[in-house]
């Protein structure tokens, strides 16, 4: 159990380091600094150390074993960069909402940082793009707004094309891209 505490804490800190790195590039350093602080709450931390396994998310492991994860629910509802936070009309089956720009940008930083943690030396922006396409974009059960999915796809595609996150530093371009995609709301 002590090893789980140490290793999980190392993963959180390493993840936060990478999120901050990308968030600074993206022009949202305060969000990068405060990113995922709920992971240190008892609800999330205790469950995570109970289900910690090297190389996989402990919350996904708990969900696999028990069918749900209280820590995952807590995490998604306390962190606005998660698409699960942006849901409405639950009595009608749920409706994904458009994430505000700064949270969509933080989600990109989050995915990149998670890729750094889980892919380790195999990480590349092409690998990350492939992961995004397989696990998010082409996953029909994802309850993310289709326009936000499209924005993320375009961003990951550009990073994969140049094998670089430099695009994040072009704040005006990224904002224009987001706005141009989100303004196509009538097409969805």
How would you name each of these model-derived features?
Residues 1-188:
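Metal-dependent phosphohydrolase cores
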């Amino acid at each position: 159990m002590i090893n789980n505490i140490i290793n999980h804490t190392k993963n959180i800190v390493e993840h936060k380091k990478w999120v901050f790195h990308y968030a600074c590039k993206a022009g949202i350093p305060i969000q990068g600094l405060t990113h995922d602080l709920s992971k240190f709450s008892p609800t999330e931390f205790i469950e995570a150390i109970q289900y910690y396994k090297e190389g996989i998310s402990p919350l996904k492991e708990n969900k696999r074993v028990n069918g749900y994860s209280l820590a995952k629910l807590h995490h998604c509802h306390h962190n606005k960069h998660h698409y699960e936070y942006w849901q409405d009309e639950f009595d009608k089956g749920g409706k994904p909402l458009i994430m505000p720009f700064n949270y969509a940008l933080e989600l990109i930083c989050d995915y990149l940082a998670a890729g750094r943690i889980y892919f380790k030396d195999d990480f590349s922006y092409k690998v990350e793009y492939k992961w995004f396409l397989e696990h998010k974009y082409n996953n029909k059960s994802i309850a993310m707004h289709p326009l936000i999915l499209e924005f993320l796809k375009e961003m990951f595609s550009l990073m994969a094309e140049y094998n670089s996150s430099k695009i994040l530093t072009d704040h005006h371009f990224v904002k224009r891209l987001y706005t141009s995609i989100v303004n196509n709301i009538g097409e969805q």
